[in-house]
Amino acid sequence: MVITIALIGRTNVGKSTLFNKLTGNRNDALASNHASLTRDRKHGFIIVNNTKIVLIDTPGINEDSKKKISLDKEIFEQVKFSIKQADLVCLVVSARNKLMHKDVEIIEMLRKFQKKIFLLVNKIEGLNFDLVKYEFYTLGLRNMHFISATNGIGIDFLTNNICSFFTSQKNSLYKKNKDFDIIYSITNDKKNCCQNLNKTIKIAIIGKPNVGKSTLINVLLNEKRVIVDSNPGTTRDSNWSLIIRNKINYMFFDTAGIRKKNKISTYIEKISVHKTLKILNLVHVVLLVIDAMDGFSDQDFYLLNLIIKNGCSVIIILNKNDKLSEKMRINVLNSKMLKLISHVKCHFISAKHNMGTSIIFKLINEAFFNSIKKIHTSKITEILKLAITKHQPPIYKRDRIKIKYAHIGKHNPLTIIIHGNKLEKLSNVYKKYLTNFFQSKLNLVGSSIVLYFKSSKNPFIK
């Protein structure tokens, strides 16, 4: 059973700050004084008195969210979906703005869903409590909490009341998920998240703005999880979802699009890009989404090098295949970029029309399990000797650099430790040769290989 709480409210009332406070992660949801910063639903995992609870941070409802027919309408649909999903709805309002007409409208809307409602009056620091209390008590809601998400005022009392509520309602709470079993979880350290789950594969979906990343993740999750819009930069934060498919756990991170540095103009975009790059240190597999109509750009090549440098397995997803002719597909596959990365698989899809997407899970499995494949030390040393025979190490100060043996250091990424003398003098060209040689002989499609060179110390040199 998954117990779920949704944080609902107007824009800029402190929902994301409260989300970060409750989940114990300062940087999980983007929080700022800018209105409408959160655009997609974000899920967090909190534990209150040994009770595991899913927390949903929803986009802020604007004054005219129901009237607009573009992005604001999409945001409102995200909010309604979260309300339906939730066992408890926490309506967050701002004490500084006092009670607004929009707050009353939201309460009326929530009552139609027949959900239990907690009213959270946020930003009470420095205000006259009696005046604030009187104004919001006129709403007639029984469960009311006066808090400061920034300073932590009233948070402990709130969490205890949440736990008491779920304890009293535990017999009536039951969830049944169709098509996919969806589980949401988060911890303070995402490197250890889902450690109690077996075979959790973490996947980041990365690419330039407006290449179809959010559309793809909605298809993979079989639900409208993130907002899709034709304007670049719709996704601002790094959203994640965990699904179970064929008894394997997949944690997907949908990230903000990364433009060239000289085109990043706003502070919010800088934060979003920084968080996207940090995710590369947390995931096992990266789906690099490229607009097949545009072909490979310098920015795509930069992102690919960044992914490989971080040791992630990578699959190139060429989206918008429905718009390509056969000749255009051949030209894309014959690009210079692909010839440099023969170990990386490319796959054509149309996320919009759900074409070619079903095989993506198979490609993810292949890339991930290749990265943790057990390889005997004797085979590694045998491949190393063959590489040296075909192309000897360079000479340094009249002596040839000596490479002795190699073994596996760790997996995911596969790290091979090579021992020898004066290995620090090896050129980058020769190191690249060895990496490519191991890649071809081990046939680890989609997986990165990292070589670590360890020189033996001369006992006669002090």
Curated annotation (Swiss-Prot):
Binding site for GTP 1: 9-16, 57-61, 122-125
CDD domains reported in the protein's UniProt record: EngA1 (cd01894), EngA2 (cd01895)
One Pfam short name: KH_dom-like
Binding site for GTP 2: 207-214, 254-258, 319-322
EngA-type G domain span: 3-170, 201-372
GO molecular function, a single term: ribosome binding
Domain KH-like: 373-457
Its biological purpose: GTPase that plays an essential role in the late steps of ribosome biogenesis.
PANTHER family linked to this entry: GTPASE DER
Entry protein name: GTPase Der
